[in-house]
Amino acid sequence: PNQAAAEMRARLEQRLGGKRAVAAMTIGTFHAICLKLLGDVRLISPGEALTIAEQVLRESGRKGGGKTLLQSVSRVKNGVSPEDTGLDAELYGAYQARLRDLGALDFDDLLTEGLKRDVTGLRCFRHVLVDEFQDINDIQYQLVRSWSRSGELFVIGDPDQSIYGFRGADCRCFQRLQEE
């Protein structure tokens, strides 16, 4: 498991009286929770994603590196507009088509697919706690709101400490939450 999630679990176990006290809790990163909610999915490795990106570039006759394409694809999937990333819609479509053909998801698809699945009312939590709230992006914000729709939401963060704007993080999430 993710180191931050493991540390959070350990702190909760210590404060609440052991492993049994937190056994029923869902603790993890957005990606880990979405993976758990999605169930049996084929998640490609970063190496496989790079191979696919390089194939897409080669087949399109475009120049550029697979890593650059993957970075742009990731930013778009995390809420940055394609115009801001310079990502060509044709390349994005070809990359996604290749994933569909393989019946697979990449790391960033976990959030978008998790949100699609959750919109059907699949999962709602009684209590949702989010640490480092200033670093979430729009997709993660939508997940938080969906997961907490029938429960309590508690967020921790500092809008002045947001460092992931390049990945789509939006510290205005605090204001947005307050307005809703």
Place the predicted regions along the sequence by residue.
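Accessory N-terminal region flanking or inserted into the helicase ATPase core
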Residues: V56-L129, D138-L143, V155, G165, ...
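A short helix->loop->beta-strand "cap" motif at the edges of active sites that frequently abuts
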Residues: V22, R149-E152
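Walker B catalytic acidic pair
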Residues: E132, D158
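N-terminal membrane-targeting/anchoring modules of bacterial envelope and secretion proteins
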Residues: L43, L50-L57
